[in-house]
Amino acid sequence: MKRPHIVFLDAHTLNPGDLDWKCIKDLGEFTAYERTERENIISRSIEADIIITNKTVLRREHFEKLPKLRLICVAATGFDVIDVAAAREFGIPVCNCAGYGTRAVAQMVVAHLLEVANRVGHYTAACHSGFWSQQNDFCSWNNPLMELQDKKMGVIGFGNIGREVINLLRPFGMLLFAVTSK
């Protein structure tokens, strides 16, 4: 059986330099491009059986010129960068990484909430500038902290990420609710 030719059009989006791509190389002939400009998509993918993309947009005009293409893998949770209807017309399945990053995104939401409540960045800058040590009593409350307990917070969307945000915030004693269109 012929090993597939796999092309990753924008590998920099997943690899800050710490991946060797071995697991993909084991599957077939693999080429990873850091970035691919729109005008280079066809030339870089002409022999591809499989394209992996994260942000590089693929449309009908590409599928028309890539007769060997058998699969598109989106290295993200969504696949809005792909003209899925056109891919379907050409018999090209599109898959994504559903559930990828749920914990990391929820953690970032909580980090931003804690920044709003505690102003960590503000106090870090104040410490670096010497503000704290210049106070007569070596105490600085130039911005009050917000305690999260008993504060109300609504989460818009109750999918995987919304549920995880609520799970992470429960220990703070907040009054949490979710709003969803479903």
Name each region found by the language model:
Residues 34, 75-76, 92-103, 180:
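Short beta->alpha connector loops at strand-helix junctions that form conserved
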Residues 44-45, 63-66, 148:
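A short, aliphatic-rich alpha-helical micro-motif
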Residues 90, 98-152:
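Phosphate-binding beta-alpha-beta segment of Rossmann-like dinucleotide-binding domains, i.e.
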Residues 139-182:
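Rossmann-like dinucleotide/phosphate-binding beta-alpha-beta segment
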Residues 1-48:
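N-terminal glycine-/charge-rich "phosphate-binding" loop or analogous flexible N-terminal tail
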Residues 80-92:
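Rossmann-fold NAD(P)-binding glycine/threonine-rich loop
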